[in-house]
Amino acid sequence: MTTYKPYGMTELQSLLQQAAEQKLPVLTRHQHSAGLGIDFQNWNKIREIDTVNLTVTAERAVTFGELEEAVNEKGLHVAMMTEDLRAVNLGDFFAEQMYCLTSLHYNQPRLQILGLEVLLADGTVLQVAGKTVKNVTGYDMCRFYISNREQLAIPLAVTIKLVSLEAVQTMLEAYIADEAVLVKLAARLRQQNITPQVCLYWNKAAAELLQQAEPAGRLIMVCNGSKQRLEKDLQAISAIADELQIGLQLCEQPEQVWYEIKMLRTHTVWGDGVKVPSLRCDGMLRLLAKQQIACWYNPLQGSLQLIPAQADGVLYRQLCSEAEALGGVGNWYYMYQYGFAAAGETKIWQRLKQKFDAGQRLNPLTEGGAEHGAE
């Protein structure tokens, strides 16, 4: 694969034209396929921080760390940012649909995107939506373009809704061996309307992957807010932990925790691999423990990030079946690659691809293909 680093729109559009003439796939990520690769490292500017509308517009190569540092100076915060994402750029985050640790607290990342500049397969540049929050009538093209893993269009710049920078933050940790306790914890937190900024659990297999010699899985909770609000939430969480006999305590090494989460991201094979109702996740966790499959997830959400020792379509299909038996679902992106996605959804996808990328060249997916160890 030949990789180019265009400096401007004219050069970028010329590359797409070249790919079309030579009938080469256009690859925007680090695939090992033959084709024309585009490295967007020169799309690295923060175009605007709007303190009136509370938005920031930045190009795709800007990292979360750079973005957060810039908006912090204005007393603002990028809600989807957590320390494990500091070196991740915006383009990779959305192209790979990375798991957002704060989505339950602040909303899903795609709902925090107010505007987009996207490049279509034919070289057309579109400006989609804008700075203000509004209800959408008809198709929401902003969410459509940000959610397709760069299969239909390439986001070049995003406008993100910001929130006020919280003054106080506390990290708590505990070790939990009984999966049923996690379900009870999620239920009690919901009953008291407590949503930590981050609530994350990784199982014993994931701990072993991180070379942690712990007897059980690890629970991490990050709470933020004003001092008064934080004290109230911590008292309620402490009472719940005592009730469930969870040895919850202040985390003394938060930097190490963020590093470990970063490592879990690096090892993850099936991001949002399966989704199971949070109150039935114990069944899925027991199955994963039996097969020694590492996983991490938010106990309040039920979207599991999976790290199998060997990824293949047979195993993924089995896990999807187990998730469905618990009222959950698999991930269409992986099901398509492993060749067992629903026919109706596959047909819709193929029609969208034909409409937006008739040459089938933008980061092409192959049904039953080899990506992620597919058969």
Per-range role (PLM):
Residues 2-80, 328:
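Glycine-rich N-terminal segment of FAD-binding domains in flavoprotein oxidoreductases
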Residues 9, 22-24, 39-41, 68, ...:
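Conserved glycine-rich FAD pyrophosphate-binding loop
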Residues 28, 199-202, 295-299:
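Short beta-strand
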Residues 31-33, 51, 214-216, 297-304, ...:
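Short Gly/Ser/Thr- and Asp/Glu-enriched loop/turn motifs at secondary-structure junctions
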Residues 32-47, 58-60, 103-122, 154-157, ...:
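Structural signature of FAD isoalloxazine-binding scaffolds in flavoprotein oxidoreductases
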Residues 34-45, 71-76, 96-106, 132-137, ...:
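A glycine- and small-aliphatic-rich helix-loop capping segment at beta-alpha/alpha-beta transitions
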Residues 54-119, 127:
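A generic, well-ordered mixed alpha/beta core segment in the N-terminal half of proteins
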Residues 95, 114-266:
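C-terminal substrate-binding/cap subdomain adjacent to the FAD-binding core in PCMH-type
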